[in-house]
């Protein structure tokens, strides 16, 4: 019985570690890569002379929405408060994504490759949110009023992620943000606001 209990504890700890590694070393890089691929698709579609600054501003809005949840997960204790903000930003991001595609439709060609990339950009934030929920299931249940007391305070992590990992994620975010700022600048120079 005792060996079974220890085995179960080790297995649960292993699942938690694997989930965290999956979030940090798979989901986040795939998300950043999809952001780069989407920018490249916009560039190939000549966005500055088609949908212009309006669509580009929508892209930066989506970056800000996803960045809020990412920064909270990177630096703050994940609890009911952080999960609630994450769920809210995910919902807003999905609505903004619908606005993005609706606006682009008829203004520029959205190729099958770009549509495929959009699939990643929509699903990867959901994957990240789901993994964060699984890792902090007690607070997810508490936030839903199912069990325990929710902690709504936004506060720094008790056990911060490594400096190297935080620096890497911030650098990736900065690089992708820079691409979309370049896109907006290119669109503004071309002077295409709303064709």
Question: Whereabouts are the PLM-identified features?
Answer:
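Short amphipathic, positively biased membrane-proximal segments
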Residues: 1-195
């Amino acid at each position: 019985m005792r060996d079974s209990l220890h085995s179960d504890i080790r297995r649960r700890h292993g699942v938690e570690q694997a989930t965290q590694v999956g979030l940090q070393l798979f989901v986040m890089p795939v998300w950043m890569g999809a952001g780069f691929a989407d920018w490249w698709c916009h560039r190939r579609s000549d966005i500055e002379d088609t949908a212009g600054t309006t669509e580009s501003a929508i892209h930066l809005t989506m970056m800000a929405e996803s960045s809020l949840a990412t920064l909270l997960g990177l630096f703050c204790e994940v609890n009911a408060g952080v999960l609630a903000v994450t769920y809210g930003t995910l919902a807003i991001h999905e609505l903004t994504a619908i606005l993005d595609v609706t606006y682009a439709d008829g203004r520029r060609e959205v190729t099958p490759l770009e549509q495929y990339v959009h699939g990643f950009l929509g699903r990867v934030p959901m994957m990240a949110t789901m993994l964060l929920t699984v890792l902090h299931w007690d607070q997810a249940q508490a936030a839903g009023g199912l069990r325990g007391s929710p902690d709504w305070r936004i506060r720094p992590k008790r056990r911060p992620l490594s400096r190297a990992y935080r620096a890497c994620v911030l650098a990736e975010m900065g690089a992708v943000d820079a691409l979309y700022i370049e896109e907006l600048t290119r669109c503004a120079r071309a002077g295409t606001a709303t064709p």
